[in-house]
Amino acid sequence: MNLDQLDKILVAQIEARTPNNGIDAMCQHAPTNRLIWWGCLSAWSIWRPTPPPVEDAALAIAARWVFQPSDDLRRAAALQAKSDTVGMCKWLLQAVQFSGGQLKTDEAGIAVPTPNVSGPYTKGFIHNLLATSPPVERATASQNLLQLARQAITRPMPTAEPTQPKPQLV
């Protein structure tokens, strides 16, 4: 399925007010980098203005992987996901870790193939995020996350980490 077809499905699910079906479609058909980016956008929208510190550290790893996918960041995600302090973003870190391809878990080890199971991990992350919303607000939050899913698949992907704007002298 291409991104235009997925976008049409998401639009239909938004209009039908069936966000769970839209979340399922996104997690089954979106490319991995766009799934991870959607997870980051969703977390930042739920935890506005700033995520809890432990979640922020995990989101930083996931967002950096979107900007520059590398095995080093996949290993960092795997290590952070095993940490006792990691919270809900553990799901998103595992989506990065299991984004497919060979992964050498340590310097002495051998490269082990990892399946691309980013979709199920991202789905778990999104549903856990929604569970933190009060029940009355959950339907609105679900619709908002589907709008973010549309942004993640229709807008150009970021290619470099954002930088702080330079102050303009007046």
Question: Whereabouts are the PLM-identified features?
Answer:
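Structured binding/interaction patches within domain cores
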Residues: 1-155, 167-170
